[in-house]
A protein has these predicted regions:
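Terminal peptide-recognition signature
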Residues: 18, 58, 70, 105, ...
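A general structural signal for well-ordered alpha-helical segments in protein cores
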Residues: 35, 55, 67, 95, ...
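Adenosine-nucleotide cofactor-binding segment
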Residues: 1-66
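Residues in the short beta-alpha loop(s) of Rossmann-like NAD(P)-binding domains
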Residues: 12-13, 86, 111
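Short glycine-rich, flexible loops that bind phosphorylated cofactors or substrates
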Residues: 65-67, 88-89
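C-terminal hydrophobic helical "lid"/dimerization subdomain
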Residues: 113-162
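Rossmann-fold dehydrogenase core element
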Residues: 76-83, 92-134
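Conserved helix-to-beta-strand junction in the class I
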Residues: 72-74
Length: 162
C-alpha cells in the first residue's frame, strides 16, 4: 500500500493465507524463535534493497507471550502499536528496551472516523479488503460464538446478519 515490506506472523496453517492477502513474508509465531526468523527476514530484505535492516512498526495484538520479543526487534525511534492482548494483559517489561531505544508505544482500538474513511477509500480502490471467515444468522449466534471461542479453522471476521 505504501511501498512497505510486510512480514506477517501467524500460526503454521495461516501462513500461506497471509501471503495470499499481500504479506511479502510470513513467520510462524508459535515457534520459540519466531522473532529471530522475523529479524533474519528483515535483514535479507534490507540487503536486497541496499538499506539499513530495520523493522519500523510492529502491530501487536497477542500481548503477554510475545511482548518482550517484539520490543527486542525494534531499533531506535521505532514504533509498536498494541491493539489487543490475546495471551494476556500483564507483561513484565525491561524498561531499558524502551528508553534506551527511544521507542514509541501506541495503543489503538477501533480507530477514528478519519481512519475509517481512509480505510474505505483504500477498500474502494481494491488496495485493502476485509477478510470474512463466515457469516451466521442471528439464530446461529451460539454456534458463531463457539466458533470464535474455539479459534479453530478461523481466519478473518465472523459476521452476524439478521
Amino acid at each position: 500500500l505504501y511501498d512497505c515490506d510486510v512480514i506477517a506472523t501467524a500460526s503454521q496453517g495461516k501462513l500461506e493465507k497471509c501471503v495470499e492477502l499481500g504479506a511479502d513474508f510470513a513467520v510462524d509465531h508459535r515457534k520459540e524463535d519466531w522473532h529471530k526468523e522475523g529479524k533474519k527476514t528483515a535483514t535479507e530484505i534490507s540487503k536486497q534493497k541496499s538499506k539499513e535492516s530495520e523493522i519500523d512498526v510492529i502491530y501487536e495484538h497477542i500481548g503477554g507471550s510475545h511482548w518482550n520479543k517484539e520490543l527486542s526487534l525494534l531499533k531506535y525511534g521505532k514504533t509498536i502499536v498494541t491493539t489487543g492482548a490475546t495471551t494476556g494483559y500483564d507483561v513484565m517489561t525491561d524498561l531499558r528496551h524502551i528508553f534506551f531505544k527511544g521507542l514509541n508505544i501506541v495503543g489503538s482500538t477501533q480507530g477514528t472516523r478519519a481512519e475509517l474513511e481512509s480505510g474505505l477509500h483504500w477498500m474502494a480502490r481494491g488496495k485493502m479488503r476485509s477478510v470474512v471467515d463466515s457469516v451466521f444468522s442471528l439464530e446461529e449466534a451460539s454456534t458463531a460464538h463457539q466458533k470464535m471461542l474455539s479459534g479453530k479453522d478461523l481466519f478473518g471476521k465472523i459476521l452476524m446478519k439478521p
